[in-house]
């Protein structure tokens, strides 16, 4: 998963933003000045020996933001990095969910293809029984044709699933950051993941572990710092300077210390609206936290309901429906051999068993997909 391009990009973005706070807490670069003041002529050194107004000067000045501004700028940058860190976690979870989605779809397709190939062999044996009965005058040609038609349908489904498997393999390789021409990924066995969470535990997990909420809370904290910084806009910024001016021979040198201040003279048009803007953005960030908490809770609840429902369905398939369907096909075959039921009954029993087995694997895959979607919201739940 660490080779997934989206995950790599999110990590690099986070690492880049971690370099910003120290920059924002650092004073602006000082300015160095070199100047020459001539007298009576623009020519260099004019008045050097005749006027005490001539000088060649060297100076340095430093901008100093108002008290607390640099600290708050650094705090805001830290929150930007924190947001990026949670976005990196979210990218990891999203990539994991996509990987698992493709994997479990491949699992379903692999199992279904194996099932279709196995059941097609059983169908060919049923077809042979129908042919044998037809040869001795106890069956109909229509029975053989029905078996052949069902076998063709199954073959068509196998071809369709193979085509879909190729697409899913491509999706899985892309999610893993592998080349498309790399070897296909082997699909192993899958067992239902046990999820033992009640609604209270689920709500707590959402509040503590949802990456979307972590992003929103970091954004809310950022908006708090941005409001504090906006309020600091009423305080002036300063410029401190020092200069040394060398005069001609016989005259005294000059030494100059300066202190300047940037006054927020038009505060009602700049600083006050900026504070109002920051306050509104803080309110929006708070509401966003609440909105995402409700959305994440509802989504997690939906997935938990789906998990519990599929748990029950898997037990019903494994312990009830499939064994009953297996008994039904055996009974139908036995009755068909002695002409107690028609061939349509046998085909119907065969198709019922095939569909139930396919539905079992579909339910198992959907169960694991729901677990993957839940873990995208709240992290690991095993």
What name fits each language-model region?
Residues 161, 211, 363:
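Metallo-beta-lactamase
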Residues 7-24, 91, 95-116, 125, ...:
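Amphipathic alpha-helical coiled-coil segments
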Residues 88-207, 303-306, 310:
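Periplasmic alpha-helical coiled-coil/stalk elements that build and connect Gram-negative outer-membrane
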Residues 74-78, 141-149, 343-351:
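Short, charged, amphipathic alpha-helical segments
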Residues 29, 96, 199, 235, ...:
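ATP/adenylate-binding site constellation spanning eukaryotic-like Ser/Thr protein kinases
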Residues 30-90, 214-292:
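Small/polar-residue-enriched beta-strand and adjacent coil segments characteristic
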Residues 137, 177-178, 339, 378-380:
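Short helix-capping/hinge motifs at transmembrane helix termini and TM-loop junctions
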Residues 1-36, 43, 49, 54, ...:
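Bacterial Sec-pathway N-terminal export signals of envelope proteins
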């Amino acid at each position: 998963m660490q080779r997934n391009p989206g995950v790599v990009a999110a990590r690099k973005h986070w690492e880049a933003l971690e370099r910003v706070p120290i920059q924002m807490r650092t004073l602006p670069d000082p300015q160095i000045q070199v100047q020459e003041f001539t007298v009576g002529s623009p020519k260099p050194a004019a008045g050097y020996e005749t006027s005490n107004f001539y000088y060649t000067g060297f100076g340095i000045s430093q901008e100093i933001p108002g008290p607390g501004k640099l600290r708050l700028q650094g705090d805001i940058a830290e929150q930007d990095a924190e947001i990026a860190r949670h976005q990196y976690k979210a990218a990891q979870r999203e990539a994991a969910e996509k990987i698992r989605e493709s994997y479990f779809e491949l699992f379903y397709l692999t199992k279904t293809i194996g099932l279709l190939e196995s059941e097609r062999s059983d169908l060919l044996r049923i077809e042979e029984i129908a042919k044998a009965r037809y040869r001795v005058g106890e069956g109909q040609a229509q029975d053989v044709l029905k078996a052949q038609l069902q076998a063709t349908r199954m073959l068509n489904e196998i071809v369709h699933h193979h085509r879909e498997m190729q697409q899913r393999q491509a999706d899985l390789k892309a999610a893993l950051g592998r080349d498309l021409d790399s070897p296909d990924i082997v699909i192993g066995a899958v067992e239902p993941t046990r999820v033992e969470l009640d609604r209270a535990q689920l709500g707590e997990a959402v509040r503590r572990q949802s990456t979307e909420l972590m992003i929103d809370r970091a954004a809310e904290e950022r908006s708090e710092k941005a409001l504090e910084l906006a309020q600091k806009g009423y305080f002036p910024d300063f410029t401190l300077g020092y200069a040394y001016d060398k005069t001609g021979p016989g005259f005294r040198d000059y030494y100059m210390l300066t202190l300047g201040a940037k006054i927020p003279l038009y505060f009602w048009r700049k600083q006050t609206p900026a504070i109002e803007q920051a306050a509104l953005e803080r309110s929006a960030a708070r509401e966003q936290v609440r909105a995402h908490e409700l959305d994440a809770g509802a989504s997690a609840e939906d997935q938990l309901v789906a998990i519990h429902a599929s748990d029950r369905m898997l037990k019903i398939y494994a312990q009830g429906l499939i064994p009953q369907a297996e008994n039904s096909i055996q009974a139908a075959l036995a009755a068909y051999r002695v002409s107690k039921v028609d061939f349509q009954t046998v085909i119907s029993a065969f198709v019922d068993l095939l569909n139930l087995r396919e539905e079992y694997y579909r339910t198992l895959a959907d169960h694991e997909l729901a677990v993957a979607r839940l873990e995208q919201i709240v992290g690991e739940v095993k």
